[in-house]
Amino acid sequence: MTGRTSSKRRVGSAAAVVTLALGGALAAAAPASAAGMNYKPISTATDVEVRVQSSGKCLEVADWRTDDGAPVRQWTCTGGDNQKWRFTDGYAVNVHSGKCLEIPGYSTAPAARADQWTCDKGANQRWGVVNDSQGSLAVVNFHSDLVLDVNSGTAADGAPAIQWYPTGVSNQRWYFNPSVVL
């Protein structure tokens, strides 16, 4: 009986070693954050549309809502104030609602959806940018070090804005209209 227990312990120990080794390999392969990127807070002197490169559509507060927690999404650009933003020291304030673009609950999870909330100067409401060689911008959340992304890269109206690992794809690249020097 002692021999059987001993071999079970050896098998269990070997499985733990394999699990730890695989877990270490998986952790090493996890996507990067923007922490190593040189990003700076956004400030604009005027109200701007924020357009995603992949679809050319605008970042907006859904349905002209003014409540805390209203979702932020992409939509065909209409020129409405719910699609205009003013950036001051990295805080994006929606012109229509007067509320800030944020990742709720200080989430650091990929795929967390962006919304608007009463501005409170939290790091989850602060955004920075990184320029690329083609003039588009990665918009980075100061708290999570993840980038603003249109979910699944779809061009559909209503696709939610989320945060995701920076990969440089066009649904993570943004333009300001009118163009601003950052």
Language-model region placement:
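Short, tandemly repeated low-complexity microdomains enriched for cysteine and small residues
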Residues: 66-86, 108-126, 155-168
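N-terminal compositionally biased, intrinsically disordered segments and leader/signal-like regions
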Residues: 3-6, 20, 45-47, 79, ...
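Secretory targeting and sorting signals
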Residues: 1-34
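Extracellular glycan-recognition/adhesion modules and their associated mucin-like linkers
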Residues: 35-66, 82-108, 126-155, 173-182
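Short stretches within intrinsically disordered, low-complexity N-terminal or propeptide regions
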Residues: 18, 29-34, 47, 94, ...
